[in-house]
């Protein structure tokens, strides 16, 4: 495409001069031009060449940007019990994995956690993104919910909602999350916090409900960091395995 554009410009540069002989070459044509006109023509051709080079450079840069924009992004968060948590509280560990196909795509995540009280089967636990990645005082130093748009809970980008615990474990794949790994509101470097209670989803009738859903004590947390796709691919295989096992049980 760029080559055709350049060729067209070159033809336009020489279009006003006709060849007296059908077999005359472009070199013969250049010899027939008077010195001043020849200099003007050569200068024009040189400018066209410069323009072609600039257009080509812009085209290549756009291609590089498209590759970057289309790049799949992954992140990982290794959940550990809060350093300030009393020993009689559940010791939650596990992984939260994120994948985003591009800056404009919706985020998806795997949540794989264990250590919840087994006797509290089918209980709901809230998980949120908090503003800071500061774990110096355990999960207590992660700050409030990450809320860059200053909207009420549960519209914060990291309000992941409630997760059902079964047999002391939590495993869930969620898609269409409003949080992002790219852009000015990316959650990279921020924290994911697992709470002791259920999120009331802003329906608790008090100020705390509109801030944090009255989700209770911060049991465990982690800091979101970029990663390769390896952990995500492993969880995807685990998900397929779980589906097969579930299908076998229902047949």
From Swiss-Prot:
**Gene3D superfamilies annotated for this entry?**
Superoxide dismutase, copper/zinc binding domain
Keyword tags: Antioxidant, Copper, Disulfide bond, Glycoprotein, Golgi apparatus, Metal-binding, Oxidoreductase, Secreted, Signal, Zinc
A single Gene Ontology CC annotation of this entry is:
Golgi lumen
Give the residues the record marks as binding Cu cation: 128, 130, 145, 195
What GO molecular function annotation could you give as one example from this UniProt entry? Answer: copper ion binding
- Where the protein is mainly located, per its record? secreted
- Paste the cofactor note: Binds 1 copper ion per subunit.
- The residues that the database entry marks as glycosylated are 121
Tell me the InterPro entries matching this sequence.
SOD-like_Cu/Zn_dom_sf, SOD_Cu/Zn_/chaperone, SOD_Cu/Zn_BS, SOD_Cu_Zn_dom
Highest taxon in the source lineage: Eukaryota
Q: Which residues form the signal peptide?
A: 1-15
Report the locations given in the UniProt record. Answer: Secreted, Extracellular space; Golgi apparatus, trans-Golgi network
Which cofactor names does the annotation list?
Cu cation; Zn(2+)
* A single GO BP: response to hypoxia
Q: What does this protein do?
A: Protect the extracellular space from toxic effect of reactive oxygen intermediates by converting superoxide radicals into hydrogen peroxide and oxygen.
Q: How does it assemble?
A: Homotetramer. Directly interacts with ATP7A/MNK; this interaction is copper-dependent and is required for SOD3 activity.
Name of protein: Extracellular superoxide dismutase [Cu-Zn]
Give the classification, highest ranks.
Eukaryota, Metazoa, Chordata, Craniata, Vertebrata
């Amino acid at each position: 495409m760029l080559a055709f554009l350049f060729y067209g410009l070159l033809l336009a540069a020489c279009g006003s001069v006709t060849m007296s002989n059908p077999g005359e070459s472009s070199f013969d044509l250049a010899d027939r031009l008077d010195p001043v006109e020849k200099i003007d023509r050569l200068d024009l051709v040189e400018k066209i060449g410069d323009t072609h080079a600039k257009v080509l450079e812009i085209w290549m840069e756009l291609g590089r940007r498209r590759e970057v924009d289309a790049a799949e992004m992954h992140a990982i968060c290794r959940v550990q019990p809060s350093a300030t948590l009393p020993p009689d509280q559940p010791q939650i560990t596990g992984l939260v994995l994120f994948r985003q196909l591009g800056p404009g795509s919706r985020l998806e995540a795997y949540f794989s956690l264990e250590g919840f009280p087994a006797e509290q089967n089918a209980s709901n636990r809230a998980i949120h993104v908090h503003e800071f990645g500061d774990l110096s005082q355990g999960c207590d130093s992660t700050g409030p919910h990450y809320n860059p748009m200053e909207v009420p809970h549960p519209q914060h980008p990291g309000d992941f909602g409630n997760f059902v615990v079964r047999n002391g474990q939590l495993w869930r794949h969620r898609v269409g999350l409003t949080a992002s790994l790219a852009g000015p509101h990316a959650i990279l470097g921020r924290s994911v916090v697992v709470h002791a209670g259920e999120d009331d989803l802003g329906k608790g009738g008090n100020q705390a409900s509109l801030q944090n859903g009255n989700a209770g004590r911060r049991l465990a947390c982690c800091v979101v960091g970029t990663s390769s796709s390896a952990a995500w691919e492993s969880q995807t295989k685990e998900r397929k395995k779980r589906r097969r096992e579930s299908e076998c049980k229902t047949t």
